[in-house]
Amino acid sequence: MGPATPSSLMPYFDPPLPCSFDHEGSKPECYAEHARVIPAVTNFMPPSSVVELTETTPPLFDPISVHRISSDTIVKVEHYHHYVEALNLSMIRAMTTIPVPEVRQIVQHKTFTYLVMEYIEGRTLDQCWSELSHIQRLRVAQTLRGYIDQLRTLTRAVPGTLDGSACVGPFFSAIDAEPFASYDELVDWYNHKVDVVKKMRKAPPDIGTFDDSAPLVFTHQDLNMRNIILANDGTLYVIDWGWSGFYPEWMEYACMARYDDAPQSWKDLIPFITGPHEDMFNLLCDIGWALEVGYMM
């Protein structure tokens, strides 16, 4: 048997976007049929060339395997068949005006996925924040607030990822955050983590329970300064949508507030960008032991 031949794929939505995400059927499995990848009809470049170029160019970031293979193209390599970021980017481009990189091709080879995307000329906020004036920082915050408002127009009755795969993110355990069939299942999962930290005496005595009144909205889940690019033309791009999915609207605040090493001038703007949800952030921090250590309990 000869070596495996790379295959070329593309994001696919049925029915085509824009549309409602609340479909009848077995949930969340029905979303995997709605949002998936299919064989590409045409290729941006030969799939074998994508693989070869990533093997001969050094990664831009460590440990993330992102390779710049031409002046306007990068390839992000995942060590498993991970398509949800391509689906997320395609949905965002179709249903919002949030600037994100264009997905040009998906290549599958052996156990790797190669996401071929547009390269954005510019600097991430962690690289240029100190050079921005107070007014410029406020403009960035106002722009991001508008992006969050757009994301919150994308709703779904069932939490989780766009393609029905397991939930991933800073406040999900590594192995037991399987797709949830309902919002109630998600809340029960989190409240079980509360019970675990109480039982193991790893939580403050006044720890609360999870708020299930907030709507499920599309959430980036890693909106840190390294994932926001101020392009050379002044456009503010958002990158790295691999953790995104439909979660309670307070989740965006929690995921942004968790970065202790961010400048205070940035942290002060987070409540304005996402709305203040410090109570839920504190609760997520309080169950950290159950998420990271006691997730099998």
Per-segment meaning from a language model:
Residues 24, 33, 272-297:
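Charged phosphate-binding loop/patch that engages nucleotide di/tri-phosphates or the phosphate backbone
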Residues 121, 225, 243-244:
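Short, glycine/acidic-enriched loop or turn micro-motifs at the edges of active sites
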Residues 46-51, 85, 208-211:
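Short Pro/Gly-enriched beta-strand edge/turn motifs at strand-loop
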Residues 1-65, 156-160, 293-297:
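Phosphate/pyrophosphate-binding loops and the adjoining catalytic core of nucleotide-dependent enzymes
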Residues 183, 213, 217-218, 231-282:
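Active-site Asp-x-Gly
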Residues 137-142, 150-221:
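An alpha-helical support segment within catalytic cores of ATP-dependent transferases
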Residues 20, 51-176:
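ATP-binding pocket architecture of kinase catalytic cores
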